[in-house]
């Protein structure tokens, strides 16, 4: 066994969006699967974002600013992270295939709330990253 065989082979995770009730993969009008690609938790991009958020919280605490964290704060932080780790997508939203932006991703993840769960589940499952 070589430890390099257990090194991640990709810095991203592709999530095929599934109907929240039936589990069927959702399709765009052109018959392609609806997908969202996010940076994996071991990626440089993901880690930088987490460091940025943690540093902000630490700085706020050290300067005696707000130290209480509410459920709303946690939800906002989750939306912020998910929208910023989204690297690409192929989706139909509001009858169009929108260009990816952090703002559009936040809107999508807020309005179509079950997508967050599918992304978080895919990130948790992304430990299945080893070479065959």
Predicted ranges, named:
Residues 1-60, 129-132:
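Short, charged/polar N-terminal "headpieces" of proteins
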Residues 10, 41-43, 63, 83-87, ...:
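Generic serine detector
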Residues 35-39, 47, 67, 71, ...:
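Intrinsic-disorder-associated interaction segments
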Residues 49-88, 94:
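Negatively charged, Asp/Glu-rich surface segments that serve as flexible interaction/assembly modules
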Residues 88-132:
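C-terminal charged interaction modules
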